[in-house]
Swiss-Prot record:
The gene is rlmD. It comes from Escherichia coli O1:K1 / APEC. The keyword Transferase applies. Pfam families: TRAM, tRNA_U5-meth_tr. This is 23S rRNA (uracil(1939)-C(5))-methyltransferase RlmD. Residues 10-68 form the TRAM domain. The lineage of its organism: Bacteria, Pseudomonadati, Pseudomonadota, Gammaproteobacteria, Enterobacterales. Belongs to the class I-like SAM-binding methyltransferase superfamily. RNA M5U methyltransferase family. RlmD subfamily. GO terms for molecular function: 4 iron, 4 sulfur cluster binding; iron ion binding; RNA binding; rRNA (uridine-C5-)-methyltransferase activity. Its EC number is 2.1.1.190. Keywords: 4Fe-4S, Iron, Iron-sulfur, Metal-binding, Methyltransferase, rRNA processing, S-adenosyl-L-methionine, Transferase. It catalyses: uridine(1939) in 23S rRNA + S-adenosyl-L-methionine = 5-methyluridine(1939) in 23S rRNA + S-adenosyl-L-homocysteine + H(+). InterPro entries: 23S_rRNA_MeTrfase_RlmD (IPR001566), MeTrfase_TrmA_AS (IPR030390), MeTrfase_TrmA_CS (IPR030391), NA-bd_OB-fold (IPR012340), SAM-dependent_MTases_sf (IPR029063), TRAM_dom (IPR002792), U5_MeTrfase_fam (IPR010280). Catalyzes the formation of 5-methyl-uridine at position 1939 (m5U1939) in 23S rRNA. S-adenosyl-L-methionine binds at Q265, F294, N299, E315, N342, D363.
């Protein structure tokens, strides 16, 4: 007769170890060494000692969590946000801005094997002009949650304030919560986006069921009382304008219109400085022909056109190409053309590329630009500026240019997202004569 035994659950007591942190990685984690292995510990800073327990043990590294901090770094700051440590938006509010910039610059320098020439930064607080807040109805309390996701979770942190938002948007948070929490459609709301443009404030509400006339009236009254442009999104394709006109923002002496769903850089201050520095690095001359790849709706293309003889912007999203053309007309720029192209194909064979380009700028998404590096090399530009939101793909793509005879002339860390683990950068490549 067979006998079955239930296995006893094995309990393990995690050992507490004492470590000294000697570095901060670009994600804001303290870095220590233990038994010859690198240990990553969120919440700790260089020059701090702590008792920790290992939570994940890999062959090359381990992760740990703090049990007790034994000393404080002189660069430790008191987080401004009461939600820090729970909300997944920020990872580094406990570190001084100077330390954040140094650690990100060091990580970038290691990846690129080149010294960081400068840090392009602006105000460290109140910089974010766009926010997407998740909404969730709680049946038990009949309350509406509004906030950001918890770190490593799909749960929502109900936020009352957010000091990295521009002041106009942060001040709106309790008012938006009160308005949305009074709607009959509370349980059918997906998320709300708030955008601060030069033209004013936008609110885009995603709802998953039709809104009653009473709810629509409440929302419209709210938009008028707060001076908002209101947009309703019943699905991912439809956007209904309830109040307001085409939004726009000022950038580098130009006026750029955009659709509420279009991508715009969330940090207006750093964006303006980044564009100005890119033009300076390219050393644009009045006779230059310039190519802007992954151009979007013309964040770099249009300012380039104010200095060059001609500029070509190439983008893979048709709606952004159309918006770029519209903004060129709006700003009276007749020396710039936008093209919709598949950037995985050889753009050097297109008619608009037959005369070549003196200078090239590219600003790809996180996946990088592996498919176009050889095409850029074929064009033989004198200077190339590569703007990156992913240092790993930047380092990979740079290898092609270095092998083709280009050198890194300048490398900047863009502090586009202070207090977070996001690292953006910009590189100037010059052709060796």
């Amino acid at each position: 007769m067979a006998q079955f035994y239930s296995a006893k659950r094995r309990t393990t007591t995690r050992q507490i170890i004492t470590v000294s942190v000697n570095d901060l990685d670009s994600f804001g984690q303290g870095v220590a060494r233990h038994n010859g292995k690198t240990l990553f510990i969120p919440g700790l800073l260089p020059q701090e000692n702590a008792e920790v327990t290992v939570t994940e043990d890999k062959k090359q590294y381990a992760r740990a969590k703090v049990v007790r901090r034994l000393s404080d770094s002189p660069e430790r700051e008191t987080p401004r946000c009461p939600h820090f440590g729970v909300c997944g938006g920020c990872q580094q509010q406990h570190a001084s801005v100077d330390l954040q910039q140094r650690s990100k610059s060091a990580a970038l320098a290691r990846l690129m094997k080149h010294e960081v020439s400068e840090v392009i930064a602006d105000v460290p607080w109140g910089y974010r002009r766009r926010a997407r807040l998740s909404l969730n109805y709680l049946p038990k309390t009949q309350q509406l949650q509004m906030g950001f996701r918890k770190a490593g979770s799909s749960d929502i942190v109900d936020v009352k304030q957010c000091p990295i938002l521009v002041p106009q948007l942060e001040a709106l948070l309790p008012k938006v919560r009160a308005c949305l929490g009074s709607l009959q459609a509370m349980r059918h709301l997906g998320h709300v986006e708030l955008v601060q443009a030069t033209s004013g404030t936008l609110m885009i509400l995603r709802h998953t069921a039709p809104l009653s006339s009473a709810d629509r009236e409440k929302l419209e009254c709210f938009s008028h009382s707060e001076g908002l442009d209101l947009y309703l999104a019943p699905d991912s394709e439809i956007l209904e304008t309830v109040s307001g006109e085409m939004p726009w923002y000022d950038s580098n002496g130009l006026r750029l219109t955009f659709s509420p769903r279009d991508f715009i850089q969330v940090n207006a201050g750093v964006n303006q400085k980044m564009v100005a520095r890119a033009l300076e690095w390219l050393d644009v001359e009045p006779e230059d022909c310039v190519l802007d790849l992954f151009c979007g709706m013309g964040n770099f293309t249009l300012p380039l056109a104010t200095q060059a003889a001609s500029v070509v912007g190439v983008e893979g999203v048709p709606a952004l190409v159309e918006k770029g053309q519209q903004n060129a007309r709006l700003n009276g720029l007749q020396n710039v053309t936008f093209y919709h192209e598949n950037l995985e194909e050889d753009v050097t064979k297109q008619p608009w590329a037959k005369n070549g380009f003196d200078k090239v700028l590219l600003d790809p998404a996180r996946a990088g630009a592996a498919g176009v590096m050889q095409q850029i090399i074929k064009l033989e530009p004198i200077r190339i500026v590569y703007v990156s939101c992913n240092p790993a793909t930047l380092a990979r793509d740079s290898e092609a240019l270095l092998k083709a005879g280009y050198t890194i002339a300048r490398l900047a860390m863009l502090d586009m997202f202070p207090h977070t683990g996001h690292l953006e950068s910009m590189v100037l490549f010059s052709r060796v004569k």
